[in-house]
């Protein structure tokens, strides 16, 4: 996919203990031909990005709770302002945990139900892709995608009222499922409520998911389903006048 507008520019936040930032940057630069900047968590300037990425890892060693310290990093004020203005933000794994701790997404991520760290390829069913055209516009409801997971605290939980609200608003966008797209207990790797693997905020511009799309963006490493999220972003940005008019 080639943009006629300037290349997308993404900022990847870096916290002490995260490590997926370089995977995201590699995909952005080498696979997609985008610009990617790694910005340390103490900074307050996101450097005029088109999108912001919160990567996976163990920010601050996951002390207290996953993401509990990272949410207070200076960069998060800038991320919150960017998201409030409608800017697209994605948080994968630890990034999802940080988004939840910061209040940008509801609910929390807890220890896996079986108390084991899970690192494997996982099948997921796409739900309500229209709720997030920026991140899921290239995916179709009901289809099954395959992304890797790598977490010990990925069990999504929320109170019943919040879960019902998310469901009713179409904000549950990914569920753990088997290869046939059936959401079952056996297909759920961590015990997440209602098999939830990914959700979006009310505007749909902030996506949190436990799987790692950046690790499924090259055929050589096992699959390219993750690349479709970035293609969705690229197409969405291409349609925005502010991006088309930007001069690098």
Predicted regions: what they are:
Residues 1-92, 100-106, 112-118, 125, ...:
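N-terminal beta1-alpha1 cap of cysteine-dependent amidohydrolase-like domains
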Residues 41, 178, 201:
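Acidic surface patches and DE-rich sequence motifs
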Residues 57-58, 95, 152, 213:
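Active-site metal-binding loops of divalent metal-dependent hydrolases
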Residues 10-11, 146-150, 207-210:
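Active-site-proximal beta-strand elements of phosphoester/diester hydrolases
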Residues 196-220:
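A glycine-centered loop/beta-turn motif at secondary-structure junctions
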Residues 8, 142-144, 201-206:
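Beta-strand-turn-beta hairpins that frame and shape the catalytic cleft
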Residues 104-193:
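Pocket-forming structural segment of enzyme catalytic cores
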Residues 85-86, 168-170, 202:
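Structured helix-beta-strand junction loops
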